[in-house]
Amino acid sequence: MDLVSTSTSPFSCRICNQKAHGNHFGVLTCRACASFFRRAAFSKWSQLKCQKGGCSRNFCKRCRLKKCREMGMDTTKFQYNRDSFRATGQFQLPPPRSLASFVGRPELFLFCDTEAPNAKMLIDVRYLLEEAGRIINQGYETPASGKNQLENLTEGFKYIKVDMNNISSSKYASKDAIISMWEYYFFTVTRWLMYFEGFQKLNSHTQITLIQSVWNVWSRLHKYVATVDYHKANPDTLPTNVVIHNTLVDIENVEFDSTWLSDYPVEHVRRYLSVQHCREFDILGTLRKLNPSELEITYLFAQICFEHAGKRNQGDIMKVTEQFLDSLANDLHDYYVNEMNNSRYFLRLTQLLKINQAIQFSDISPQKQIRNNIIKKEAEKLEKLQKSQFSIKRLSISN
């Protein structure tokens, strides 16, 4: 609507003859008369008689309202819901951002039958703990000779480094192959930790608890390191090729037997797992760019394992792992300053640790999500996907 300035308007209000403000509800009026009509248009004054018996200049409310209507003020020109706030009772939740968030299920399984029977299949893994205990009792395979704990642990790098001459390829991931992979990583982590003096001094219960806590996260970092090494040695290989254990797998084309893991269709399970793989390219790119030494890689493995175990178990184990991390950090500082002659290593170390951060955070933006919620949501997705469970819950692959 066209407004007329009160300081320069030569026009008068059609209701009270005061200086006009503008066109309100179809009539040139002042602010006061416009506000009055807005308040009184649907009030009792429309039905009452004149309070003075006849108004000529100083209108009563009934006559003022009558004059407004006679001059042409129109209630159909009222505008509603223009306030910058809303009453509490009118608040409405925004619509969900996606169907998956509304339903509470991963996108890949929206149209699967949620009522279908999903009996759990028990996987007996007690023999893993028995074999790990035997390895611990055997002690070193070869005595460590490093000058500090990080160097001793680096002597176990032979368990991290993959023999490129003995890598086989596979186009089918069977149940036996997957369980064999779990065994390999569980026992390899145990042998590797035996090179760490602090681990040897722990009681057997704490040792087993640490192994149970870290074997899975250790295997994830191992997959990245082995894959980067393979791509360096074979630059023409497909970017979707990854090395798991000592096997080359095209993650996009591998046939996957998931019938023992889940009742969901195989293609849905594989698609879910391939989505997880798509998130890993940044980690692989960072490893290629930084090209860390054996000692730096060893520190990455130790850092992610002990930090993960501490946060997961809390209490006394967290105190122990914090001591381990402090000791290893001092050894790494000595390596950078005295051997690499690099006292300004902070930026490089920060970039290296971002690899571990990405693994733990599943590369979902930490600026937008709380870490605990991320882990909980991803674990819930995997829990819905699985129909198998370990005889020892702490060994679950979702941990």
From Swiss-Prot:
Coiled coil: none annotated. It is found in: Nucleus. Residues 149-392 form the NR LBD domain. SMART domains: HOLI (SM00430), ZnF_C4 (SM00399). Residues 10-80 bind DNA. Transmembrane segments: none annotated. InterPro entries: C.elegans_Orphan_NR, NHR-like_dom_sf, Nucl_hrmn_rcpt_lig-bd, Znf_hrmn_rcpt, Znf_NHR/GATA. A zinc finger (NR C4-type) spans 13-33, 50-63. One of its GO terms (molecular function) is zinc ion binding. Keywords: DNA-binding, Metal-binding, Nucleus, Receptor, Transcription, Transcription regulation, Zinc, Zinc-finger. PROSITE patterns: NR_LBD (PS51843), NUCLEAR_REC_DBD_1 (PS00031), NUCLEAR_REC_DBD_2 (PS51030). It comes from the Eukaryota. One of its GO terms (cellular component) is nucleus. It holds the Pfam family zf-C4. Orphan nuclear receptor. Belongs to the nuclear hormone receptor family. This is Nuclear hormone receptor family member nhr-125. It comes from Caenorhabditis elegans.
